[in-house]
Swiss-Prot record:
GO terms for cellular component: cytoplasm. It is found in: Cytoplasm. Pathway: Cofactor biosynthesis; coenzyme A biosynthesis; CoA from (R)-pantothenate: step 1/5. One of its GO terms (molecular function) is pantothenate kinase activity. This is Pantothenate kinase. The lineage of its organism: Bacteria, Bacillati, Actinomycetota, Actinomycetes, Mycobacteriales. The gene is coaA. Its EC number is 2.7.1.33. Belongs to the prokaryotic pantothenate kinase family. It is an enzyme of class 2 (transferase). Pfam families: PRK. It comes from Corynebacterium diphtheriae (strain ATCC 700971 / NCTC 13129 / Biotype gravis). GO terms for biological process: coenzyme A biosynthetic process. The keyword Transferase applies. It catalyses: (R)-pantothenate + ATP = (R)-4'-phosphopantothenate + ADP + H(+). ATP binds at G93, S94, V95, A96, V97, G98, K99, S100.
Length: 308
């Protein structure tokens, strides 16, 4: 049974309790599909999907269904058909914590429900200001911090999708080039569900924020020392992968030795990613509808679900 800590806004579930909330949902992914969805350095498997993500997809499905019933009630009241309003989900968390994998898994799992097969995923990386602008403003070393994003464009994008516009475009970002891809975009066309994944998607501001438009949100959490270790491990693996790609922005790291690469990864973590996490990302955790708490093995050990 979930632990209800008196004044806490969350219900706490250990993994054993949470997995039973899957009920009779069948496993809809194959091992190969999970491998293809897995991020660098992660060891997610079919058990993790069955015990963590299937219950989560069931919860979201029920909330989408409730929203659809509310829309039908509005239609009955007005005596006319209401415009289609996508259900919007935010997925937040630190660099290297596994939020991108969580978002991809949710997209695939939610697509398997007959009631909402059209599920789009957009990352906020595409809304980073172009590198040229960041250089002019002197904030290239603060890439990923709130001020490095075109917040207005991101808000306008989600607002347009939520308003039911037929075709809404979002810019595309290349981690290999470390910049937006010129003249390239993704188009979102009235999906049933839109997933928005990014570092700071749960942030608030003095006026309307993207997080105000979310119907549900997930924060992927872990101990700081674990995330640092995962970040360094991922950096070392990228030397043999993305850093060696043609035109790779970080190609100068490709031939670094293990010691030098580890030191550089730790420097980047401690001077950029850790401050961003502590100052801007972690404080938004309290706004999440649900928190996935990972253990040192990169697997979800506990789930916290907001009561209200």
């Amino acid at each position: 049974m979930a632990r209800d800590k008196d004044l806490s806004p969350y219900l706490d579930f250990d993994r054993e309790t949470w997995r039973h909330l899957r009920m009779s949902m069948p496993q809809v992914l194959t091992e190969q599909e999970v491998v293809e969805l897995r991020g660098i350095g992660e060891n997610i498997d079919l058990d993790e999907v069955a015990e963590v993500y299937l219950p989560l997809s069931r919860l979201i499905h029920l909330q989408v269904h409730a929203r659809q019933e509310l829309t039908q009630a509005t239609e009955t009241f007005l005596g006319e058909k209401a415009p289609h309003i996508p259900f919007v989900i935010g997925v937040a968390g630190s660099v290297a914590v596994g939020k991108s994998t969580t978002a991809r898994l949710l997209q695939v799992l939610l697509q398997r429900w007959d009631e909402h097969p059209r599920v789009d995923l957009v990352t906020t990386d595409g809304f980073l200001h172009p590198t040229e602008i960041l250089k002019k403003r002197g904030i290239l070393d603060r890439k990923g911090f709130p001020e490095s994003y075109d917040q207005r464009a991101l808000l306008r994008f989600v607002t347009d999708v939520k308003a039911g516009k037929a075709h809404v475009k979002a810019p595309v970002y290349s981690h290999t080039l470390y910049d937006r891809v010129e003249n390239e975009c993704v188009t979102v066309s009235r999906p049933d569900i839109l997933i928005v994944e990014g570092l700071n998607v749960l942030q608030t501001g003095p006026t309307l924020s993207v997080s105000d438009l979310f119907d549900f949100s997930v924060y992927v959490d872990a101990a700081l020392e674990d995330i640092e270790r995962w970040y360094i491990d991922r950096f070392l693996k990228l030397r043999q992968l993305a850093f060696r790609a043609p035109n790779a922005h970080f190609s100068h790291y490709a031939d670094m030795g293990d010691r030098a690469a580890t030191d550089e990864a730790r420097r980047i973590w401690q001077t950029i990613n850790l401050p961003n996490l502590v100052e801007h990302i972690l404080p938004t955790r309290v706004r999440a509808s649900l928190v996935l708490c990972k253990g040192a093995d990169h697997k979800v050990a506990r789930v916290r679900m907001r009561k209200i």
